[in-house]
Amino acid sequence: MLSLIEKLKQVKDFRKDKGKRHPLWIVLEVIILGTMLGYSGYRELGEFAKNNRHRLSKEFNIIPERVPSYSTIRRVMMGVDWQSLLKMFNEWALEEYGQRDDINWLGIDGKSLKNTLKNPNNEQQNFIMFVSLFSQESGLVLHIKRIENKKGSEIDECQAIIEDCTLQNKVFTGDALHCQKKTISLIAKSKNDYVITVKGNQKNLYQRIQDLSNSSKPESCFLEQDNSHGRKISRKIEVFKVRKDERQGFENLRRVIKVERKGSRGDKTYEETAYYISSLTESAQVFAKIIRGHWKIENQLHWVKDVIFEEDKSEISDFQAASNWSIL
């Protein structure tokens, strides 16, 4: 917590000194603490500060009657520069967690903020999205980028995260949107590896790996069953070697992974086949774990923000305030 406070002190304060009761970092810390305890919205956080004023006054050495109010919290959330807050978070997360032993498989994915949607029914539609770099093993977010829909794309921000990332010898995982030659080239340049989904957005590659998996013998195979959460799923994972002349411009492509899934939930059954490309040369069992782990970014990050913190239901629709809220 002390390292976070030191970083919060570096966030630029937009307020004038006259009439200012609290340093910006104290207001931000109160917002973080309240959010962690399930308070959302300006008024709820104002109530949190009021109800816990004696504890907060002791921790932050402020007068109990002068803990940050609803109006102060609202003003700060709408006024603090999201770029300064974002820079602070990214520096803090990498310094605090970047050297941990359980930071190896890094999922990358975007999440839109539904509460910021403007003009949903015409060409002027706009909203805020955040792209996160998420550790599968630890459940920690290591880097985030913010996009305004009309001014950027998830692909561009994903590539920017890879360029900014100073970690090496890690494995980036991503969905088919990020099966881009430039993205994969940047991963290779950063001295990291990848496991990326392939779908029809890369038609030639998709057809080639289908042909490869149908005409070649897998070098590794793994079968697994999953009977949890009221569903039954069987998975068959096969790994195929890729020659250098078969890479089609995807740098360091060494293996194709084919995953066949068969399952049922209640009375409904389904079958599907998915394909992945990778620079790794692991066994089918290891690839199975990495591929399953990628979806933790959905159920351990995006789900938590939506269901626990009710991000999409938030009444905060102002782009600046909503961006700051999502970062914190």
Describe each region flagged by the PLM.
Residues 125-129, 181-199:
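A short alpha/beta connector and helix-capping loop motif
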Residues 30, 109, 194, 298, ...:
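A residue-level signal for conserved active-site and pocket-lining positions in enzyme catalytic cores
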Residues 24, 293-328:
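Basic, amphipathic alpha-helical segments enriched in Lys/Arg and hydrophobic/aromatic residues
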